[in-house]
C-alpha cells in the first residue's frame, strides 16, 4: 500500500511539474525570447556562410582524441580485476595510440590555426 501511495504521489508531482514547465513559458512571449541567441549577429540572415576547413579539421581531431580518452575512463575501475597486467597493457596501447596521433597531427601541421 505504501508503495502505491509513493508511486501515485511521484507520478502526480511529476505531471504537475511538467505541465507547469510547459504552460508557464507560453504566458509571456517576447520577440527576444522567441529568437535564438547567436553570439551577437543576426540569426535570421543567410546560413550559407563559408565554413573554414581548418576549423572542421581541428574539430574532427578533437572528437577523435576525445573518443580515445573516453576509452580510458573505465580503466580506474578495471584495477579491481585480477588481471592487472592486461589492464596496464591495454591502457599503454591506448595512450600510445593517442600520443602517436598527436605527434602525427603536430608534424603535419594539423593543429596550427594560422596559415
Swiss-Prot record:
The chain crosses the membrane at residues 3-23, 55-75, 84-104. Keywords: Electron transport, Membrane, Mitochondrion, Mitochondrion inner membrane, NAD, Respiratory chain, Translocase, Transmembrane, Transmembrane helix, Transport, Ubiquinone. Its EC number is 7.1.1.2. One of its GO terms (molecular function) is NADH dehydrogenase (ubiquinone) activity. GO terms for biological process: mitochondrial electron transport, NADH to ubiquinone. InterPro entries: NADH_UbQ/plastoQ_OxRdtase_su3, NDAH_ubi_oxred_su3_sf. Its main location: mitochondrion. It comes from the Eukaryota. It is found in: Mitochondrion inner membrane. GO terms for cellular component: mitochondrial inner membrane; NADH dehydrogenase complex. It is a multi-pass membrane protein. It holds the Pfam family Oxidored_q4. It catalyses: a ubiquinone + NADH + 5 H(+)(in) = a ubiquinol + NAD(+) + 4 H(+)(out). Core subunit of the mitochondrial membrane respiratory chain NADH dehydrogenase (Complex I) which catalyzes electron transfer from NADH through the respiratory chain, using ubiquinone as an electron acceptor. Essential for the catalytic activity of complex I. Core subunit of respiratory chain NADH dehydrogenase (Complex I) which is composed of 45 different subunits. Interacts with TMEM186. Interacts with TMEM242. Belongs to the complex I subunit 3 family. This is NADH-ubiquinone oxidoreductase chain 3. It comes from Sigmodon hispidus. The lineage of its organism: Eukaryota, Metazoa, Chordata, Craniata, Vertebrata.
